[in-house]
UniProtKB/Swiss-Prot annotation:
Encoding gene, per UniProt annotation: AOP3
Domain of life: Eukaryota
UniProtKB keywords: Dioxygenase, Iron, Metal-binding, Oxidoreductase
Record-listed E.C. numbers: 1.14.11.-
Binding of Fe cation, residues: H278, D280, H335
GO molecular function, one term: dioxygenase activity
Family the entry assigns: Belongs to the iron/ascorbate-dependent oxidoreductase family.
Keyword 4Fe-4S tagged: no
Organism lineage: Eukaryota, Viridiplantae, Streptophyta, Embryophyta, Tracheophyta
InterPro entries, A to Z: DIOX_N, IPNS-like_FE2OG_OXY, IPNS-like_sf, Iron_ascorbate_oxido_reductase, Oxoglu/Fe-dep_dioxygenase_dom
Name of the featured protein: 2-oxoglutarate-dependent dioxygenase AOP3
Organism: Arabidopsis thaliana
């Protein structure tokens, strides 16, 4: 089975001889381009982050999440859903803008520990190393398309946001689903929805634990697939009890049969979702899973690849902004988190690069030709982000295409 299971490309970025202009650099540059054109992401073997630093980051995260609730709630941010969130004791997360910059990390520390705390230095150093890795990969990408002149402008037009996440082990009798498209820019907010489904007079209680991502606005509607093996398709309107989410509504789509079991394979997959299928809106993201897996990436053929954590590996994933910048040459892949571990706490960290406000994303002329006609109109990332908050943006099969696609007719 293992040999038949699809896997993401694994690219070694840890070789000390990997320097611009070297033969190794040229080979890796080609591998990165092919992996991103084929999958929109790849696994990276790295040595920029030592095992010792990884262990220190985990301890720092555990220390963060062990703080009293009132202390954690001091992690606030003017940007909606970009600070700390926790609901129902199932998941919680912190957000740190410019986590790679020491001064900004200190500001985050002051929110939680006014007296100071040295452990945050480990997180800042970790973010700094991941940022260096991200910039190297984006440099490789631009070089591979022959637009070296654009590298400095591109790298200087972005900033980073880090997300630290903790998924608490679920009870065996919970059916877990999630909502939250853009993990690239913020927290996962957890909410409850309880619903009863009647089938020939039988009442079946369904509890749904929902992770709501940072980009959910008031009055938003979101679709959640819940696979309960009951053979009768039904729509259940479940209210999201989320303080930060206003009166957003989750539509729970279930399938129920007389035995009310969760035996179907598809039902089990839906029931284990910790974050549903989505594309990121960022330029890029680097994701680290500590020991417990969960991330799955969808291929062009519609197959799901489950990414198993391995020592000294991270996942580089392209977002919608990078897809637009590269004129569609690099896709932003659909991915999800499916939590199958029932008795273990899952920790994960992600660093996302985003265009700065006011910077216009426009494909370089070298990427537009007869074979690759212009696919997207120029846009400000903030406008894309705001469009994503609208009903039209939420309902669109592709937010990017609906917002600025040449075929969108805007």
């Amino acid at each position: 089975m293992g040999s038949c299971s699809p896997q993401l490309p694994l690219i070694c970025l840890s070789d000390q001889t990997l320097k611009p202009g070297s033969s190794k650099w040229v080979k890796v540059r080609s591998d990165v381009r092919k992996a991103l054109e084929d999958y929109g992401c790849f696994e990276a073997k790295i040595d920029q982050v030592s095992m010792e630093l990884q262990g220190s980051v985990l301890k720092a995260m555990q220390e963060l999440f062990a703080l009293p609730t009132e202390a954690k709630q001091r992690n606030v941010c003017p940007k909606p859903f970009a600070g700390y969130f926790s609901h129902n004791g199932l998941s919680e997360s912190f957000g740190i803008k410019d986590a790679n910059i020491l001064e900004k990390a200190h500001e985050f520390t002051q929110q939680l520990w006014p007296e100071g705390n040295k452990s945050i230095k480990m997180i800042q150093l970790y973010a700094e190393k991941l940022a260096e890795l991200d910039m190297m990969v984006r440099r490789l990408i631009l070089e591979s398309y022959g637009i070296e002149y654009f590298i400095d402008e591109h790298l200087n037009s972005t900033y980073y946001r880090m997300r630290l996440m903790k998924y608490i082990a679920r009870p065996d009798n919970d059916i877990t689903a999630a909502v939250g498209a853009n993990v690239d820019n913020g927290a996962n907010d957890n909410a409850d929805g309880d619903a009863n489904v009647n089938d020939d007079g039988a009442s079946i209680g369904v509890k749904v634990n929902v992770d709501v991502g940072d980009d959910v606005n008031d009055n938003d509607s979101v679709n959640i697939g819940v696979g309960v093996d009951i053979n009768v398709e039904t729509n259940v309107n479940g209210h999201l009890d989320a303080e930060a989410n206003g009166d957003a509504t989750a539509w729970v789509v279930g399938a129920v049969s007389g035995n009310a079991s969760v035996g179907a394979k598809e039902a089990n997959v839906d029931a284990e979702l910790g974050l549903p299928s989505h594309t990121d809106k960022s330029l890029s993201g680097i994701i680290y899973q500590h020991q417990i897996d969960g991330l799955e990436v969808k291929t062009k053929e519609g197959k799901w690849i489950r990414v198993k954590p391995a020592p000294n590996t991270v996942i580089f994933i392209a977002g919608d902004a990078l897809c637009a910048l590269m004129n569609g040459r690099i896709p932003s892949p659909y991915h999800r988190v499916r939590v199958t571990e029932k008795k273990k706490t899952r920790y994960a960290a992600a660093l996302f690069s985003n265009p700065k406000e006011g910077y216009i994303i426009d494909s370089p002329k070298e990427l537009v030709d007869e074979k690759h006609p212009r696919a997207f109109k120029p846009f400000d990332f903030v406008d894309l982000f705001n469009f994503y908050h609208t009903e039209a943006g939420r309902r669109a099969p592709s937010t990017l295409q609906a917002f600025c696609g040449v075929s969108a007719g805007k």
